[in-house]
C-alpha cells in the first residue's frame, strides 16, 4: 500500500507583514498628497528662479520699432503693419475714459515688484548697461548758482517715503481677533481709569478750598455790588404834591374840598406805577449780570 501523505496548510507569517506594508504605503501616499496641496497653497517667498531664467517676452511692436524692414532677421516686409503701427497708440491716447484714468488707492505695497526692480538694476550694473545719467553734469554758469538752494533750506522727502512704506507694510498685515474676554478687560480698565481721574479732580478741589476765602467770592461781589450802580437811563421820579385846600372865605358854609382833575385828562407817557418801575429795574439788572 502506498503511503499517502496528508497535505496541511501552512500559515504564512509574511501575509501580515505584507498587509502592514500596504497600509503604511497608503498612509505615506496620503501624506505626500496633503503636503503637495499645502505647498501649492503657500505663497512663494520672494522671486521664483523660473521667472528669472525665462526672462521677459519681447512684444512684436518693439521688434517692429527696432527692425521695421527686417534687416537683421530677414524675410518679407509687411507694409500694412508698418502703416498701422502708429495708429493704435494715437487712438489709445485720445480715448480717455474715467474708468481707466482714475484708479483706487489700495494702500498696499508689493514687495516682489521692488525685489525684481533691484535685481534688474544689479544685473545691468554687472553687464555694464547702466545709464550713467548722474555723471553727465552740464557746465554751470554764474547765473545758475543764484538759483541753487542751500542744503539747510532743501526739503528732503526721505522721511515721507519711509513713513508711507511703513504704513503700507502695516496695512498689509491682517488683524487678529483677540476675543470677547480681551474687549471686556479693556472696557473695565477704561472705566477704572475714568473713576480715578474723577476722584483725583474732586480731591484737588477739596484741598484748594479754605475757610477764609470762599470759592464764590466773585459771584458774591457781583451780586452785592449791583445795587450800588446807578442807572443812566432810569425814569425820573416826580414828587407828587398833595392837593391844597381852598382858602376859607366869609360866608362859605361848605367844607373845603381838594381840587379834582378833569375826567378826560391824559396821563403822561413817563408816568408809571411803582410796581411796574421796580419790575423793569429788576429785569435790567438781571440782563447786565
UniProtKB/Swiss-Prot annotation:
GO cellular component, one term: chromosome, centromeric region
UniProt region (Interaction with SNRNP200), positions on chain: 5-58
Region (Disordered): 1-27, 86-109, 232-289
Keywords (A to Z) from UniProt: Centromere, Chromosome, Chromosome partition, mRNA processing, mRNA splicing, Nucleus, Phosphoprotein, RNA-binding, Spliceosome
Modified residues (Phosphotyrosine): 147
Modified positions (Phosphothreonine) in chain numbering: 253
PANTHER family given in the database record: SPLICING FACTOR C9ORF78, TELOMERE LENGTH AND SILENCING PROTEIN 1 TLS1 FAMILY MEMBER
Record family assignment: Belongs to the TLS1 family.
The protein's name in its UniProt record: Splicing factor C9orf78 homolog
Source species of the chain: Pongo abelii (Sumatran orangutan)
Lineage: Eukaryota, Metazoa, Chordata, Craniata, Vertebrata
Amino acid at each position: 500500500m502506498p503511503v499517502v501523505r496528508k497535505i496541511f496548510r501552512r500559515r504564512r507569517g509574511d501575509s501580515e507583514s505584507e498587509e502592514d506594508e500596504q497600509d503604511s504605503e497608503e498612509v505615506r501616499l496620503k501624506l505626500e498628497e496633503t503636503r503637495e496641496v499645502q505647498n501649492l497653497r503657500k505663497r512663494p517667498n520672494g522671486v521664483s528662479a523660473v521667472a528669472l531664467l525665462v526672462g521677459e517676452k519681447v512684444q512684436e511692436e518693439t521688434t517692429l520699432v527696432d527692425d521695421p524692414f527686417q534687416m537683421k532677421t530677414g524675410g518679407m516686409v509687411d507694409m500694412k503693419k508698418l502703416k498701422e503701427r502708429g495708429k493704435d497708440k494715437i487712438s489709445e491716447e485720445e480715448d480717455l475714459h474715467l474708468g481707466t484714468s482714475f484708479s483706487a488707492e489700495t494702500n498696499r505695497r508689493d514687495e516682489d515688484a521692488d525685489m525684481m526692480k533691484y535685481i534688474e538694476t544689479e544685473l545691468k550694473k554687472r553687464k555694464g548697461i547702466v545709464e550713467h545719467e548722474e555723471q553727465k553734469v552740464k557746465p554751470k554758469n554764474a547765473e545758475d548758482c543764484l538759483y541753487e538752494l542751500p542744503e539747510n533750506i532743501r526739503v528732503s522727502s526721505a522721511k515721507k517715503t519711509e513713513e508711507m512704506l511703513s504704513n503700507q507694510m502695516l496695512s498689509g498685515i491682517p488683524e487678529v481677533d483677540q476675543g470677547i474676554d480681551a474687549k471686556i478687560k479693556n472696557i473695565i480698565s477704561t472705566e477704572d481709569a475714568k473713576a480715578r481721574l474723577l476722584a483725583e479732580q474732586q480731591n484737588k478741589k477739596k484741598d484748594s478750598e479754605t475757610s477764609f476765602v470762599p470759592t464764590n467770592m466773585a459771584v458774591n461781589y457781583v451780586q452785592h455790588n449791583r445795587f450800588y450802580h446807578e442807572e443812566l437811563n432810569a425814569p425820573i421820579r416826580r414828587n407828587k404834591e398833595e392837593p391844597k385846600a381852598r382858602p376859607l372865605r366869609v360866608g362859605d358854609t361848605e367844607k373845603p374840598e381838594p381840587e379834582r382833575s378833569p375826567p378826560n385828562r391824559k396821563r403822561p407817557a413817563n408816568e408809571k406805577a411803582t410796581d411796574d418801575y421796580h419790575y423793569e429795574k429788576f429785569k435790567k439788572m438781571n440782563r447786565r449780570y
